[in-house]
């Protein structure tokens, strides 16, 4: 494979033959804004292009604008940034339609419990259209896995924080596999070798380079080895948002030498380039054999040298020629139907939950221990006057603290949300499918978590006999579990920080618990805030009422009717039955799930706003949160 890039290409011949994508950007400026530091230019008048069949590497020191350039031309610029300039596809203003492009992020956000084969197969079922049979989708997945050199590790689990799995290089190749199943013509990769050793980096980049045929590939990369650098066709070298060099990667060494900064013998050229233009550690750099200049002076010399070179003129000429062409429009490809996506996601999520010990199994074990402790504490509570308080305390603990412990699954919720956000951003499926799948897959486990510990605590305590009473108790507990999980999923989708999410979720539940009507009876609650509206908003009120009515109605303790105990001791509203309380809880569950869906949809705006508020510098912007239609701007 040669990395020599011709100065010009006859587009009229190439475009019809391979249907490739020519991407150009001209006089591209990007400005980032922050509350603390105001506005700052991140990209400053960049011009360049990417062509089919070639790998363009965007290089530069940290903070040079590599990822910002990649995000801008990929249409993923963050909400706290503004851009100007032209970005054209095949010489036209058009959007990057689904299936025509793919973006591989720097982080490998994958489900750790799945095998490589499962991850790619499920992704194929989600992305590829219903018009394709299951065997055809499987064949595409197998070919993709083989193309990335993963056929020998297909049955190995990916692994993560919950257990050991495949290597970092293999994870990166899996991430790439998931994005090229639709055979996109344009592939963006953000730091594909980040965190990998030199050998793994080479094999990952070699696999990427092997995908170049008929495809335009653009990758931001920090410090490639000599072997990795040899795989690049074109090089875009940035420093402080300005172009230092754009042209054939093989000609970069000559350019630096002609500019007065030759690469020393036996030194990695990319190391020399980055060391020369890195202004973060300003130092005197040798020019020729005698003179020394500061880094800023060197950068200015290189930029002026580039603008006066044939390479600069070739770029301007090539961009102008591409822009004059009437290339093909990118058609949006179809993917699996909403029902298919919901079913596939449900199946995938169910398997993930079954294998992730921290999702439900560990919580089930803890719940069983607590239920045994609760049952032994209130064992055979009896019918004495003291049993009124004992029954109430036991039911309150079940409805409040057992459900409160759903925050234990928050780490798994966060991992789910990360995977969802990556897949949604890349167009694999929509928010509705995810919320439905999350709800359906969680129900069997939460039912199990409600029934087993609930039965232990219920029968050890000696609460009301009768199958109906226990079923109602379990239904209320199950519904409360679902409500709390919905609440925690809402928090996980809104709060970008793990610790903040735990604190926020626990804080919200604590306020609801305090206003539920047990720690202070309903009539004693302060009316502002605690009773109106919090008492009526908290699900604890209806859980307490339902469980207490289920237990005390029809019960006699020392010749006192259970109804009188409910009315006078617990100050329960007896104008409606316990089934109304259950219906209200079910309504709240539906409301919370709908709210979860709305928050997920609005998260593209809310989450970047939170990040922008928390950031201290425009350099900390995360540009992959909200895609903007930059091609229509």
Swiss-Prot record:
The record places domain ABC transporter at 23-265
Give any Gene Ontology cellular component: plasma membrane
Please describe the quaternary structure of this protein. Homodimer.
Name this protein carries in UniProt? ABC transporter G family member 1
What residues form the membrane-spanning segments?
364-384, 394-414, 440-460, 470-490, 498-518, 580-600
User: Per the record, what phenotype accompanies loss of this gene's function?
Assistant: Disturbed release of volatile organic compounds (VOCs) in flowers, including benzoides and phenylpropanoids, which accumulate to toxic levels in the plasma membrane.
Specify whether Cell cycle is a keyword of the entry: no
